[in-house]
């Protein structure tokens, strides 16, 4: 019986080794206003199943299927997860749409990705812009306890200062859920997920929460003597 139970556990869903990597975490010199820029579908730009480089941080991801409306879902979740913070003031992504259209028309689409973010933030009087790219957002095929194809999600996120275009902070999430037998070191997430195969939405929201754990806090002014 013990051998049987061990075999069952090892076949239950775990995840890949790499979920979140903390990198380039700076103490920001932003004041308060941060524009949430809509997530961009990079598979629509580069195609599926190719190695693509992030135009902001340079990290390479394998693209894949991106479910319909995944970009809007992640953009909305990013806003929800940050909106209650007292140290920042968010500008919703919806306010950027008209500005982006005008900038692309004015510059005949020759702006770099970073310049587009900076100019949009400047037009909306933001101190920083928080943007992200989606490389994969593949839904699971199957149910909670048995799948033909597991969920797979990859995205990155960046905080850029408007005044000089400097990248202040960035982080990323990259996971394809695997059976625990393929990675016994992922027992923690395996237990948190109640030994089941999760959806792409669940994976993405969980990954976004993990990524935001390293999100920097704006500098506070020195107290007057």
Give residue ranges: language-model regions.
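Bacterial N-terminal signal peptides
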Residues: 2-13
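N-terminal segment of the mature soluble domain
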Residues: 42-133, 162-170, 201-218
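C-terminal/domain-edge helix-coil "capping" segments
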Residues: 15-46, 120-124, 136, 147-154, ...
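Extracellular loop and loop/strand-boundary signature of outer-membrane beta-barrel proteins
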Residues: 142-145
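Secreted/luminal cysteine- and crosslink-motif detector
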Residues: 12, 16, 55-58
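Short N-terminal micro-motifs specific to bacterial/archaeal maturation
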Residues: 6, 108, 191-194
């Amino acid at each position: 019986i013990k051998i049987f139970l061990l075999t069952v556990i090892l076949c239950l869903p775990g995840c890949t080794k790499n979920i979140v990597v903390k990198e380039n975490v700076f103490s920001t010199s932003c004041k308060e206003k941060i524009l949430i820029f809509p997530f961009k579908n990079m598979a629509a730009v580069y195609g599926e199943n190719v190695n693509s480089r992030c135009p902001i941080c340079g990290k390479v991801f394998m693209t894949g299927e991106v479910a319909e409306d995944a970009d809007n879902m992640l953009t909305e979740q990013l806003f929800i997860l940050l909106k209650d913070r007292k140290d920042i003031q968010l500008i919703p992504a919806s306010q950027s749409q008209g500005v982006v259209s005008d900038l692309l028309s004015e510059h005949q689409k020759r702006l770099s990705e970073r310049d587009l973010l900076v100019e949009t933030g400047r037009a909306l009087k933001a101190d920083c812009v928080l943007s992200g790219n989606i490389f994969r957002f593949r839904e699971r095929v199957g149910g909670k306890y048995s799948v033909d194809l597991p969920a797979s999600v990859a995205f990155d996120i960046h905080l850029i200062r408007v005044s000089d275009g400097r990248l202040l902070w960035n982080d990323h999430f990259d996971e394809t859920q695997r059976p625990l037998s393929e990675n016994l070191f992922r027992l923690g997430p395996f237990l948190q997920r109640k030994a089941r195969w999760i959806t792409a939405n669940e994976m993405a929201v969980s990954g976004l929460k993990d990524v935001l754990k390293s999100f920097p806090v704006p500098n506070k002014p020195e107290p007057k003597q």
